[in-house]
Curated annotation (Swiss-Prot):
This is Shikimate kinase. One of its GO terms (molecular function) is shikimate kinase activity. Its EC number is 2.7.1.71. It catalyses: shikimate + ATP = 3-phosphoshikimate + ADP + H(+). Signal peptide: none annotated. Pfam families: SKI. It comes from Thiobacillus denitrificans (strain ATCC 25259 / T1). The keyword NAD does not apply. It is an enzyme of class 2 (transferase). Substrate binds at D36, R60, G82, R139. Monomer. Keywords: Amino-acid biosynthesis, Aromatic amino acid biosynthesis, ATP-binding, Cytoplasm, Kinase, Magnesium, Metal-binding, Nucleotide-binding, Transferase.
Amino acid sequence: MSKRDNLYLVGLMGAGKTTVGRLLAKHYGCTFYDSDHEIEARTGVKIPVIFEIEGEAGFRRREEAVIAELTTLSGIVLATGGGAVLSPANREHLRTNGLVIYLRGSPEQLCERTRNDRNRPLLQTGNPLAKLRELYQQRDPIYRELADVTVDTARQSVAGMTRVLYGKLDLLKGEATSFDPAG
C-alpha cells in the first residue's frame, strides 16, 4: 500500500474533520471513516458513556485499536478524534500509511462551533474555552509535526477549506508518489 492511498484528518474537536473528510472521500472516490463513529458503532454507546465508564484512558485504548485497524485499509479518508495524536502508536500508523491533513482552528473559533455539542466529554466543564486553549497548547505542536498539509479553518467555509485542500493535494500529487485512491 502506498503512503498516498489514504488521507487522515487531524485537529481539535470542532475543526471540521468529519465534514471535510466526507467531502474529500466523495471527491476522490474513497471510503470515509470517522474513528469516533467507528468506536460508537462497535461499542453500541456514545463516546461520553465510554468516558464515564472507562475514563479517557479506556477510550484512548479503543481509539488506538480502531486506528490501527483502519490504517491497514487502502483508499480511505479517516477523520480522527482530536486526541488521537497523543498516542505514539497512532502517530506512527497515520504517518506511515497516508497523508495527514491538519485542520487548524483557533480555540475561540472551535469553542463557538462546539458550544451546544454535548457529545464532547472534555468540554463538559465550567470553562470550555479555557479547556480548548489548554488542548490547543498541548496538541498543536503534535499536529504540526505530523501533518503533510495544514489548512487554517479561520474565516473559511467548508467549501473554501475543501478547495484549498484540493489545490494542496494536487500539488502533492506531483511529488514522488501521487495520491491515488484506486491504489
